[in-house]
Amino acid sequence: MAARHVIGVDLGGTKLLAGALGADDLTVIHRTSRPVLGLTQNQLVQMVADAVQEISVAVGGGIDAVGFGIPCTFDLRTGMAIQAVNLPLHDIAFADVMAPRLGVPVVVDNDANCHIYCEATVGIASGASDVVLMTLGTGIGGGLFLCGEVYRGWIGGGAELGHMVVDMDGRPCQGNCPNRGCLESVASGTALVREASLAVAKQPNTALGRALEAGRELTGPLITELANGGDPVALEALATVGRALGVGIANLLNIFNPQVVVIGGGVIGAGELLLAPAREVMRRRALSPAKDVVRVEAARFGPDAGMIGAALLARDLAAGRPTGAIEGRPA
């Protein structure tokens, strides 16, 4: 009899990360990563199906369910994607499309909900009843774990923390968001690259400037690499984004009084170069007692948290446990 598996898919604004877990542990048995930029909706759906099929073949089948984490707002009443800022998924009932295509039950949730489900149940915030999470990538995803459960809002539109306005007259937000001054416009991976680009144009004779002159692409990992080597432009870009993040954290502390704030996503590879300035601003702006007892931590599972959280939702679905997310089953 084939071993049983579940698959988790973390579909981001620039790439897909998917992996299979065994029936009982957190070991990622096989994984795949694929770019998603520039795809149409049909192309994206096909690419996702191909990635799941690749993993299924690699682990020898026995797939009980597939979980998806997607940076999108879903209407829990209809299963429709109603706000997909960085992906071509507007007005698609993703679970209903994927379940018959894959031939197994699927569960679909916002990607940050998957992140926080992982970190609050088996990760850095395990044991805490109230947790706030922000994932810093192309944009900023948000997740809330309140009173021991993922909070999604009345119809699924809750916890869009990246679209908290922190500057009423700030720069326009990205993608389909109509707002100005959203947190993700100043504290995301996109904002980090923008800050570094503006700074290096004024100070080209630095390690970052020389790296770009040599043909390296300006990315978050490059900025982190050179910041760790002491490059002043890279360090200041991370500190600028960290301070903006601290404003967002302070607002969330004043509203939710969580035990733990978890920061995940690709930008968290910068570690304390990002978190130290964030904590400093948070302590100046948040109120006591919330600011005095909170922990602000990097996600334990790093960039795998969304994928693992989606797989854990799939495991719940396969076991008949309530997921609170959108479920789909093959005909």
Tell me the role of every PLM-derived stretch.
Residues 157-162:
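Structural signature of FAD isoalloxazine-binding scaffolds in flavoprotein oxidoreductases
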Residues 153-154:
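A short alpha->loop->secondary-structure connector
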Residues 79-90:
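A charged helix-plus-loop insertion that forms the helical arch/lid used to bind
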Residues 1-65, 75-78, 96-106, 120-128, ...:
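ATP-binding/phosphotransfer module of carbohydrate and carboxylate kinases, centering on a glycine-rich
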Residues 108-110, 116:
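Short loop/edge segments at beta-strand edges and connector loops
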Residues 115-121, 142-144, 163-165:
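Adenylate-forming
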Residues 10, 67-71, 109, 133-139, ...:
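Short beta-strand segments
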